[in-house]
Amino acid sequence: MMNRIITANLAFLASSLMLAQVQAAEPVYPDQVKWAGLGTGVCASGYRPLTRDEAMSIKGNLVSRMGQWQITGLADRWVIMGPGYNGEIKQGTAGETWCYPNSPVSGEIPTLSDWNIPAGDEVDVQWRLVHDNDYFIKPVSYLAHYLGYAWVGGNHSPYVGEDMDVTRVGDGWLIKGNNDGGCSGYRCGEKSSIKVSNFSYTLEPDSFSHGQVTESGKQLVKTITANATNYTDLPQQVVVTLKYDKATNWSKTDTYSLSEKVTTKNKFQWPLVGETELAIEIAASQSWASQKGGSTTETVSVEARPTVPPHSSLPVRVALYKSNISYPYEFKAEVNYDLTMKGFLRWGGNAWYTHPDNRPTWEHTLLLGPFRGQGEQHPLPVDKRYIPGEVKWWDWNWTISEYGLSTMQNNLGRVLRPIRSAVTGDFYAESQFAGDIEIGQPQTRSAKAAQLRSASAEEVALTSVDLDSEALANEGFGNVSLTIVPVQ
C-alpha cells in the first residue's frame, strides 16, 4: 500500500513539473505593448490583449504611460488602473485595451562582422579607430543623442555626429562638436563630448595565419653506433633503448609596438606549421612583446627489439638530426576601450532611468570590447529590458518607444561591432630529434673473443659504443643514453 502511495505522489510531482515547464512565463517587452481604443478586449490584427500576469510583470511601465484616472482593459475581463488608483489590477471592463504582438520581437542586438583595422603601432590603430566617421564617430554620437545628451554635433552641420573635432587627450581621444563660428539654441555652446580611453588589446589564438615558410629539412648532427652482443649459447631477444632530452629553441620578433600592449587571455599552444616538431606554450595574461622566445625540453625515448644469435653481435646505428623553420606570422587582437559620454541631458526627453527634466550634466562610461568588464552586466543590456530594475542606468524601453526598435538595434549593433587589429612579426624555431634505431646483419664472434668473455656474468651487452655526451649536449641533445636489456 505504501509503495502505491509513493508511486502516486511521484507521478503527481512529475506531471506538475511537466505542467510548470509548459506554462513557463515568457518575457514581455514593454516597448511592444500598444494601446488600442477599439473596445473591451479588442486589438488590431496581429495583436492580443495583455494578460493579468503579463501586466503585473511590467506594471510600473504601464502605469507610467497612463493618465491619472485612466482604466485600460486586459484579457479575461481584467483591467489596470492609472496612478490615481495606485495601478490597481482588478476584474472589470473598459473601452480600451493594452495589446501585445502575437509574435513579439525580443530585440537582440545584431552581431555585425568584425571591423579589421590594419596593423600598426598603437597610436596608429587608435587614430584610425576614432577618426572613422562611418564605423565609429557617427554610431557613438547617435548613441549619445538617443540617450538624451544635448548638442552631439558641430556648428557647421545640423546633423548628429557631423562636424566633430577629434583631439588627443592624455592616453585617450576626445570627440566633440566643432564650436567655431557661433550657434543658436539653448546652451548650444556646451557641446556634449565622447572620450575614448583606457585601450587594451587581447590576442585571438584561433586567428593565426602565416606567410611563406622557410624550412631546412632534417640536418644530420651525429650518428651513434654500437654493437648489441650476445655472449650466450642461445638466441637472445633484447631491447635497445636510446633516451635523450629533446630541446626546442624558438624566438619571435614583432613588427609594431602595439604588441607591447597586447595580452593573451588564456595560455595556448603555438600552432604547428610545416614538419618541424614544436611544443611551444604561450603563457596567459602577459604582454605579447615580453614573450620573445624560449626553450622547451622533453624526454624522448626510441627503442628496437632485435634478436641476437648465439655468440654474435648486431650493429646498432641511430642518427640524430636538427631542423629549423621560419615564417612571418599574424594574429588578430580584439580592441577594448572605455567610452565616456559627458554633457547635459535634454529637457525634452532623455533615457536616464529617472528621466530628469532639469537638464543635469551627466557623465557615464561604457566598457566596450569582448574582454572588458567580464563577469559584469552587459554595458547595453537591451535584451533584459523586460525585467524591472535589471536594466541599470538607461531606460531602453523609452529609447525604443521614442526612436523605434529597428533604429536602436541598428545603432547598438554598430556601437558593439567587434574591432580587431593585427599583431605581426617573424617566427623562428630549431628542434632536435632522433631517427629510428637501425639494426645491421649479425656478426659471429671469434672463438678467442668468446673464451675471454666466458667468465662474465653478462649475457648481453653493448660494445664498441660511439657516443660523446658532451658534444651531443652542445647540439641540444641532453642526457643521452643507449642501453640494452634482455627481454624477460
From Swiss-Prot:
Disulfide bonds join 43-99, 183-188. Belongs to the aerolysin family. Residues 444-488 form a propeptide. One of its GO terms (cellular component) is host cell plasma membrane. InterPro entries: Aerolysin-like_C (IPR055267), Aerolysin/haemolysin_CS (IPR005831), Aerolysn (IPR005830), APT_dom (IPR005138), APT_N_sf (IPR037015), CTDL_fold (IPR016187). This is Aerolysin. One of its GO terms (molecular function) is toxin activity. Its main location: secreted. It comes from Aeromonas sobria. Residues 1-24 form the signal peptide. Residues 256-288 are annotated as: Part of the transmembrane beta-barrel after proteolytic activation of the toxin and insertion into the host membrane. It is found in: Secreted; Host cell membrane. Proteolytic cleavage and subsequent release of the propeptide trigger a major conformation change, leading to the formation of a heptameric pre-pore that then inserts into the host membrane. Secreted, cytolytic toxin that forms pores in host membranes after proteolytic removal of a C-terminal propeptide, leading to destruction of the membrane permeability barrier and cell death. The pores are formed by transmembrane beta-strands and are approximately 3 nm in diameter. Homodimer in solution; homoheptamer in the host membrane. After binding to GPI-anchored proteins in target membranes and proteolytic removal of the C-terminal propeptide, the protein assembles into a heptameric pre-pore complex. A further conformation change leads to insertion into the host membrane. Residues 69-85 are annotated as: Interaction with host N-linked glycan. The keyword Transmembrane helix does not apply.
